[in-house]
């Protein structure tokens, strides 16, 4: 008995003393050549194991310790030569902000469960710069009808109504609210959208209601918000909360980015691998093969399910439509297609059916995409590509019909096809084949397409005219060279909410197109652009987001600037005066609501 007790005690002591693998990452200062020497220390890692982590795509040069190997996208790994502590020093770029540091460290051992590793960060002190704080004044004396988006015209008591003389006819979304001395509102509207917007306005007006007449309408028919759920998945309930925010800003289109390199986020019942494989994430096997799931996305999560069932999707559609919001889902093609390519390879392995093949096994193209993938482009010359997307289009059409909501368009992406794709074939001819193939699908089904500006450039005149006839809109960064197409303004420098608020290292986000805050979004001026502008849209890419708190932080308050520019296309007074009023409304009317709901937002 005593020996048994001692044995148990010894085993417990061994377990208690066993060290858990962990990591320390130390930021290095910038050197004269523009690089920085960073240090990564891995503690208590077993010999022969492999440590995976995620870091924004960037070349690295090791100067001490084992090599760091790039896999695909943001994934890197280190093979551990001996047990204990392993130190790596490597040259990379200087760290612009803390969120760019390596993250999601996972220990991989043969025959054992994967182990997430604790990471401790040691960042340099960075002096504050002028960009950390903008000029944000909120001393404008508000009147009762000052809300966001700002109303087109208002009359208090017996004051004359302004701007009505510029309204030649009542546009879609028009409404009028008349509030008498008793505070009882009467609403007139052009359509169901206008009736809903009137209700939103009434909910925002301070109580008790004062006598006034409001006449209001949107300057643009399209007012959108793009949500990327591919790189950092959002639950159904979180999407519904985002829709509520959109509705409160009188936005009317959710551009739902649900298929890209990193994940395929919608159930398609004919192809279970799209979600069984393409919406699950796991470390590659020891031979670096993705045998049962895709590699982790930038957030490093493994074992997670990142898709919407058909029932969940229709729930989102109905919820949005009840708030007068249309949903346009995007399946990014022909680049940004890695998730579907890998998933359909798994489908072919299971079924032996190659008739839906998305990538030619004989293709020897060598390319490097903007997000560091080498295998993410569709073989657009294969008829099987269009057979596959015909099935996808049919299912999306069916789901919208089942939900009883309109299908404005299907967004086909079309951006960032890397140079080197389709080696040995004429790139211009490949684009012609792709656009005409997608148009065949759309025309046969009586639906419209949408896409990023790349799809409209460099086409033959006949293809260009054909595209115009089946196109709802294209998202444009710049309207140059896009003559004759309906466009939705989506310039990165004004509408990409994932870009950091400032260069402060604590901010999350990228900065490749500069910094975007509520001053920048409010400054979007449609008069600076030519062409058939039907609206504006805010974009929220999610490669830097890790939580719903990150989502609302990047939306609030800068998303309001884009919403304002969708409803009111410009400002009729000096910018600082207009922005002072706008920001004063945010502080007085919007911030208390966010605080009451517990949303994370940018505080100043």
Language-model region placement:
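Feature activates predominantly on carbohydrate-active enzymes
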Residues: 122, 126, 180-375, 384, ...
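Flexible, acidic glycine-rich loops studded with aromatic residues
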Residues: 454, 461-472, 477-604
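Sec-dependent N-terminal signal peptides
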Residues: 4-14
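Short beta-strand elements of extracellular/lumenal beta-sandwich folds
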Residues: 24-48
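Active-site neighborhood of glycoside hydrolase catalytic domains
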Residues: 366-473
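Short acidic, flexible loop segments centered on an aromatic residue
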Residues: 45-68, 104-107
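Intrinsically disordered, low-complexity Pro/Gly/Ser/Thr-rich segments with frequent PxxP/GP/PP motifs
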Residues: 64-95
């Amino acid at each position: 008995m005593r020996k048994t007790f001692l044995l148990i005690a010894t085993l417990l002591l061994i377990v208690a003393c066993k060290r858990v693998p962990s990591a320390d990452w130390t930021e290095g200062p910038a050197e004269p050549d523009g690089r920085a020497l960073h240090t990564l220390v891995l503690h208590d890692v077993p010999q022969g194991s492999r440590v995976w982590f995620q870091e924004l795509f960037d070349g690295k040069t090791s100067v001490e310790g084992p090599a760091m190997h790039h896999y695909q996208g943001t994934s890197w790994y280190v093979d551990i030569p001996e047990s204990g502590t392993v130190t790596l020093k490597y040259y990379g770029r200087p760290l612009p902000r803390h969120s760019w540091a390596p993250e999601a460290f996972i220990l991989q051992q043969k025959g054992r469960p994967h182990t997430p590793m604790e990471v401790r960060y040691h960042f340099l002190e960075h002096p504050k710069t002028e960009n950390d704080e903008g000029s944000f004044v909120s001393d404008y004396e508000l009147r009762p009808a000052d809300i966001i988006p700002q109303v087109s015209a208002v009359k208090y008591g017996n004051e004359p109504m302004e701007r009505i003389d510029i309204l030649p006819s009542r546009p879609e979304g028009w409404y009028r609210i008349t509030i008498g001395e008793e505070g009882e509102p009467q609403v007139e509207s052009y359509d169901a959208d206008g009736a809903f917007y009137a209700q939103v306005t009434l909910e925002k007006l301070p109580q008790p209601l004062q006598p006034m007449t409001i006449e209001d309408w949107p300057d643009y028919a399209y007012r959108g918000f793009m949500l990327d759920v591919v790189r950092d998945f959002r639950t159904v309930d979180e999407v519904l909360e985002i829709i509520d925010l959109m509705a409160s800003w009188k936005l009317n289109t959710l551009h739902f980015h649900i298929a890209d390199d990193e994940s395929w986020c919608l159930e398609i019942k004919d192809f279970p691998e799209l979600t069984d494989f393409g919406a699950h994430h796991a470390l590659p096997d020891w031979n670096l093969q993705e045998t049962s799931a895709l590699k982790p996305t930038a957030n490093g999560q493994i074992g997670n399910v990142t898709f919407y069932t058909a029932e969940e999707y229709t729930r989102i559609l109905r919820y949005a439509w009840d708030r007068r919001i249309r949903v346009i889902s995007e399946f990014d093609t022909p680049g940004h297609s890695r998730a579907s390519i890998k998933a359909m390879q798994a489908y072919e392995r299971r079924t032996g059916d190659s008739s839906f093949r998305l990538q030619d096994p004989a293709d020897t193209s060598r390319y490097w995409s903007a997000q560091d993938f080498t295998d993410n482009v569709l073989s657009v010359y294969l008829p099987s590509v269009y057979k596959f997307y015909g099935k996808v289009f049919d299912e999306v059409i069916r789901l919208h019909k089942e939900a009883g909501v309109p299908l404005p368009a299907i967004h086909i992406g079309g951006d960032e096809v890397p140079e080197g794709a389709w080696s040995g074939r004429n790139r211009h001819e490949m684009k012609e084949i792709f656009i005409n193939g997608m148009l065949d699908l759309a025309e046969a089904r009586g639906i419209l397409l949408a896409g990023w500006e790349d799809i409209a450039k460099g086409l033959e005149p006949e293809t260009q005219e054909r595209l115009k006839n089946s196109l709802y809109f294209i998202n444009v960064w710049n309207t140059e060279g896009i003559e004759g197409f309906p466009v939705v303004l989506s310039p990165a420098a004004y509408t990409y909410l994932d870009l950091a608020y400032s260069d402060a290292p604590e901010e999350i986000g990228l900065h490749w197109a500069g910094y975007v805050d509520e001053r920048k979004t409010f400054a979007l001026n449609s008069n600076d652009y030519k062409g058939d502008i039907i609206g504006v849209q805010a974009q929220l890419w999610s490669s830097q987001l890790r939580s719903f708190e990150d989502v609302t932080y990047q939306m609030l308050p800068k998303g309001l600037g884009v919403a304002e520019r969708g409803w009111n296309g410009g400002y009729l007074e000096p910018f600082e005066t207009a922005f002072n009023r706008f920001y004063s409304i945010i502080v007085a009317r919007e911030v208390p609501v966010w605080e009451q709901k517990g949303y994370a937002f940018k505080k100043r």
